[in-house]
């Protein structure tokens, strides 16, 4: 049932206040202006008869006498195969200059998937990036962010992951993107050959902040339907969650909410968690794997956005100096696949490589301070150069099995077999034969 009101009592930023009854949170509202234009809004808060609405597209040209029509349903997005290869804005309208998209309208705010129907993650998602596949495995239905330092090319990493995984559908949610970023996503998806199975929901930096908040909900609502009804394995890429949090912050300040840490709303943790919890592996169905980008202002990992994110997600990839830092990265689900879905030497070899690389960092520090280096220090430094060039560089693009073989070769070129701390049975089986008695 639609209800029409014509008394707007307050206009502040992209928010308006209307005296109305019977409104519900998230309800979609249509605003008809005196000049014939119309726009949409959603219910953000209500207090007795005062209902606060967030207006999509801004409040410019709005007057207090315009018609406000409560539509009696939540914000919706179109779902169906017609979405594939298309691009939409924060209100669900096409921005790719193609025809209108037709399909089933679905609400964008739904509860997380029923835990009874979830299954324990058990399948590895291969990316051909050694620092992920070898040391911090990505697991199907995992929710994991990329913590990115300033100036890092995290968008290129996202697109590479999207192109090299076996996901049936890729859904990209871009928030606060510049035109250069948006154009990069479009061109790269075409160049890498997955544009036809990709859906993009894009909020540009010039768009209203309230539309930014809707992007993750739209992307995840469509992903959930694809996974549940069509049993598709969906990869959802969200960037940048710091822009999403900043939009929440701006809206909270406009509504005169009492700020919490660094001005962000006290609900920041819940606002992030309700999106990340959409990641799921469905029994006898598909899956949703969620990778997000969280930029760290000032490279500060204690900033409220990465700090709260770390408590919600199942690890993180720490992107720094154009490489994934092994010491700041973690996958809490890797033990579910290492040695079970991968080669038997995977766990021991990865642990040995990281341990020796950590020791090499100490040797490099001693060298920088002018200390005399031992033969062991020199071995570690030689190993470090090989490790960084052949496994850590983001230019490396090889399958996991080849990365494991390269790991053994690096060890054999730098150390004796008894110096690496790996079980003898694995040494006998995988250590390069020409170097076995080195």
Curated annotation (Swiss-Prot):
InterPro entries: ATP-synt_VA_C (IPR055190), ATPase_F1/V1/A1_a/bsu_N (IPR004100), ATPase_F1/V1/A1_a/bsu_nucl-bd (IPR000194), P-loop_NTPase (IPR027417), V-ATPase_su_B/beta (IPR022879)
Gene3D superfamilies given in the database record: 3.40.50.12240
A GO BP entry: proton motive force-driven plasma membrane ATP synthesis
GO molecular function, one term: proton-transporting ATP synthase activity, rotational mechanism
Keyword set, alphabetical order: ATP synthesis, Hydrogen ion transport, Ion transport, Transport
NCBIfam families the record matches: PRK02118.1 (NF002555), PRK04196.1 (NF003235)
Its biological purpose: Produces ATP from ADP in the presence of a proton gradient across the membrane. The V-type beta chain is a regulatory subunit.
Record-stated family: Belongs to the ATPase alpha/beta chains family.
Protein name, UniProt field: V-type ATP synthase beta chain
């Amino acid at each position: 049932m639609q209800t029409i009101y014509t008394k707007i009592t307050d206009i502040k930023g992209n928010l308006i206040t209307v005296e109305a009854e019977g409104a519900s949170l998230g309800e979609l509202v249509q605003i008809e202006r005196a000049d014939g234009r119309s726009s949409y809004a959603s219910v953000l808060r209500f207090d007795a008869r005062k209902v606060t609405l967030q207006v999509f597209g801004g409040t410019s040209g709005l007057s207090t006498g315009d018609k406000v029509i409560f539509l009696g349903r939540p914000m919706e997005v179109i779902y169906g195969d017609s979405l594939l290869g298309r691009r939409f804005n924060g209100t669900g309208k096409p921005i790719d200059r193609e025809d209108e998209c037709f399909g089933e309208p679905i609400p964008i705010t739904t509860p997380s998937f029923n835990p009874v129907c979830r299954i324990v993650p058990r399948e590895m998602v291969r990316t051909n990036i050694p620092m992920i596949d070898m040391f911090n495995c990505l697991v199907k239905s995992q929710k994991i962010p990329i913590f990115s330092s300033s100036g890092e090319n995290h968008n290129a990493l996202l697109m590479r992951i999207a192109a090299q995984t076996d996901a049936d559908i890729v859904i990209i949610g871009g928030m606060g993107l510049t035109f250069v970023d948006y154009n990069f996503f479009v061109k790269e998806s075409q160049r890498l050959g997955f544009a036809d199975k990709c859906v993009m929901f894009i909020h540009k930096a010039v768009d209203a902040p309230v539309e930014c908040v809707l992007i993750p909900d739209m992307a995840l609502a469509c992903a959930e339907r694809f996974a549940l009804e069509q049993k598709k394995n969906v990869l959802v890429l969200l960037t940048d969650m710091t822009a999403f949090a900043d939009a929440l912050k701006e809206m909270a300040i406009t509504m005169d909410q009492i700020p919490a840490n660094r001005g962000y709303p006290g609900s920041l943790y819940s606002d992030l968690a309700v999106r990340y919890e959409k990641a799921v592996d469905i029994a006898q169905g598909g899956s949703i794997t969620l990778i997000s980008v969280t930029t760290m202002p000032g490279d500060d990992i204690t900033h409220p956005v990465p700090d709260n994110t770390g408590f919600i997600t199942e690890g993180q990839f720490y992107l720094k100096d154009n490489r994934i830092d092994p010491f700041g990265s973690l996958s809490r689900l890797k033990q579910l696949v290492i040695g079970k879905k991968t080669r038997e030497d995977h766990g021991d070899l990865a642990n040995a490589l990281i341990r020796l690389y950590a020791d090499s960092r100490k040797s490099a520090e001693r060298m920088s301070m002018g200390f005399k280096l031992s033969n062991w220090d020199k071995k570690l430094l030689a190993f470090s150069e090989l490790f960084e060039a052949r496994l850590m560089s983001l230019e490396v693009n090889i399958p996991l099995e080849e990365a494991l073989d390269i790991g053994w070769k690096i060890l054999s070129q730098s150390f004796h077999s008894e110096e690496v701390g790996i079980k003898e049975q694995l040494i006998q089986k995988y250590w390069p034969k020409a170097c076995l008695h080195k």
